[in-house]
From Swiss-Prot:
Any GO BP annotation: prolyl-tRNA aminoacylation
Lineage: Archaea, Methanobacteriati, Methanobacteriota, Methanomada group, Methanococci
EC supergroup of this enzyme: ligase
A cellular component annotation (GO) from this entry: cytoplasm
Any one Pfam family match given in the protein's UniProt record, by short name: tRNA-synt_2b
Highest taxon in the source lineage: Archaea
UniProt-recorded name of the protein: Proline--tRNA ligase
Gene for this chain: proS
Assembly and oligomerization: Homodimer.
Length: 456
């Protein structure tokens, strides 16, 4: 783990997650194993959004130039990142089309057609799509992509600012719970004015801390106020018969949550996957001794059948040495392995190996389902607690704003530095001086701080 970046790039390939050899910078391929991790992670966020009365929808990827340019601050914020389509075949287009960097403009253009009276509100929709940003900084697989393959963007419209404010809190809770379920600890900051989402009133951001001590923004919640509503004329008739503009929020996560699960939970042997997103939660490995293969294989099939409706279980019956199988599944981060040899079977025992702690222990076969139940919970908690300890060890609270102190801490301890909030230093000049990013203002242990870090 000394060279985290090397470890990270290697694991994407050796664990069969992602192939970055695609011949276009900032783009890569989700391999089947990685695709399953992505699928289970985004199934979790889908469940949570649906649970919270959001509706999934789907909007076009192509945005006509005049539509994208409609909200001044927004287009200014994205003009250096937008990809343009200029031809249909050999025919030049009369209006060039943007590949969506994000979908405020197409969605709010349609909302104008949907919103007439206050009872048409609230609207709470989301889509999980690819989006495109011509990132000029260092691109990194699943971290800084030019084609963001898994861009979950939610957009809401409300009839009062109080309701929009409440929706921001709801979104923050959804993300907090989601990142918790992924075992990824985060620090929440309100981004500074100079680094908020283009066109937003304010931006709340979730940052996690990678093993190399750099932070990464893995989710954002924006209160858009009425900026976009005024630009897109999202006007509605109020209950009193008057007129008002809608109050909006939007919030997004991306492939970065996949990168975080890999980065925060992995170790020298490879991935350690939270059971919720593991493509295979349990691997059954029959130990085939000469002349006794049948016993182990039959028992393995029996156990497979007894588990397959409850867990994502795989029977590894490849004709290779057990040790090779053990290494493969430790590399791929399968949470639980069940080994069974003829002697175990005679004694009605099974050997369990848990990837998160590396422990190996015997259990009674009749007790398997109960054991697995408690084991899955224990693994989830252990993975989460380990990550929490690592992230906590990367947080330093200073009781002063001394620039050298801050720089010293960032270069030695790394991670996040919290200094007492003071509006006089909450400036871009200060950010220049410390040669790091001001993440924003952060509540920590009930106090208000300015959070500072080197970021991805
Ligand atoms: N180039 C990128 N590669 C991967 N993820 C990215 C990239 N750019 C942004 N993200 C992720 O996408 C999230 C949402 O992007 S954003 O610009 O902050 N917010 C929006 O686009 C709003 N429309 C809410 S979806 C960010 O918090 C970040 O985690």
């Amino acid at each position: 783990m000394e060279n985290f970046s090397e470890w990270y790039h290697n694991i994407l390939e050796t664990a069969g997650i992602y192939d970055l050899r695609y011949p276009l910078k900032g783009c890569g391929v989700y391999l089947p194993y990685g695709f399953k991790i992505r699928r289970y992670a985004f199934e979790a966020i889908r469940d949570m959004l649906d649970e919270s009365n959001h509706d999934e929808a789907l909007f076009p990827m192509l945005i006509p130039e005049d539509l994208l340019a409609k909200e001044g601050e927004h287009i200014k914020g994205f003009e250096e990142e937008v990809y343009w389509v200029t031809h249909g075949g050999t025919t030049p287009l009369d209006v060039k089309l943007a590949l969506r960097p994000t979908s405020e403009t197409p969605i709010y253009h349609m909302m104008k057609l949907w919103i007439k009276v206050h009872t048409d509100l609230p609207i709470k929709i989301y889509q999980i799509v690819n989006s495109f940003r011509y990132e000029t900084k260092h691109t990194r697989p699943l971290i800084r992509l030019r084609e963001i393959m898994t861009f979950k963007e939610a957009h809401t419209a409300h009839s009062t600012s109080e309701e929009a404010e409440a929706q921001v809190q709801t979104a923050l809770n959804i993300y907090k719970t989601f990142f918790d379920r992924m075992g990824v600890p985060t620090i929440v900051s309100q981004r500074p004015e100079w680094d908020k989402f283009p066109g937003a009133d304010y931006t709340m951001a979730f940052d996690t801390i990678f093993p190399d001590g750099k932070t990464m923004q893995i989710g954002t919640v924006h209160n858009l106020g009425q900026h976009f509503a005024k630009t897109f004329e999202l006007e509605f008739e109020t209950p009193e018969g008057g007129k008002d503009y809608a109050y909006q929020t939007c919030y997004g996560i991306s492939d970065r949550i996949i990168a975080s699960i890999i980065a925060l939970h992995g170790d020298e042997k490879g991935l350690i996957l939270p059971p919720e997103v593991a493509p295979h939660q349990i691997i059954i490995i029959p130990l085939l001794f000469k002349g006794k293969e049948e016993i182990a294989m039959n028992k393995a099939k029996e156990i497979y059948k007894s588990l397959k409706n409850t867990y994502r279980v795989k029977l590894d019956d490849r004709d290779i040495r057990p040790g090779k199988k053990f290494n493969d599944w430790e590399l791929k981060g399968a949470p639980i392995r069940i080994e069974l040899g003829p002697r175990d079977i005679e004694n009605n025992k099974l050997t369990i190996y848990r990837r998160d702690t590396g422990e190996k222990f015997q259990i009674d076969e009749d007790n398997l389902l109960n054991e697995l139940n408690t084991l899955i919970d224990s693994i989830e908690n252990t993975i989460k607690e380990k990550a929490e300890q690592k992230v906590k060890s990367f947080i330093t609270i200073l009781d002063n704003h001394d620039v050298n102190n801050i720089k010293e801490t960032l270069s030695t301890k790394k991670g996040v530095v919290l200094v007492p909030y003071d509006e006089n230093i909450y400036t871009e000049e200060f950010e220049e001086e410390i040669d790091a990013s001001v993440l924003g203002t952060t509540e920590y242990d009930g106090k208000k701080y300015i959070s500072i870090a080197k970021t991805y």
